[in-house]
């Protein structure tokens, strides 16, 4: 009986705490040297095609095929992935901020780091290409 009461209390505590923690999450900003960065690539058909391939392999499972944050893996996450299609979301983010998040990940979320030296280790070039693809495909 005591175990059941304890388990129920813990369960209620988790149900209350998770939304509160999620509400406190903010999209990470970036150090000034990143915020000042602009995408150095010439955005052309080839760059967008490669960015789309990277998005398909690395981003779609969480951010979704439509960039809405509703990928197949998103259901299992406490903090849902960013929806790139939310009006103003991408316009309010500097290229360097998106690069920083892609390279370093997002603290206290399941957004992993994709930069050189990470487990997935995308090249700088591929990170810029996927950012160009996201901007071109999902900016509202």
What are these regions (language model features)?
Residues 31-35, 52, 56-79, 104-113, ...:
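Periplasmic/extracellular electron-transfer cofactor-ligation site
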Residues 68-99, 123:
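Gly/Gly-Pro-rich "capping" loops immediately C-terminal to redox-active cysteine motifs
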Residues 49-52, 56, 93, 97, ...:
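Sequence context surrounding c-type heme c attachment/ligation sites in exported
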Residues 22-23, 75, 82, 103-137:
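Axial heme c-ligation environment in periplasmic c-type cytochrome domains
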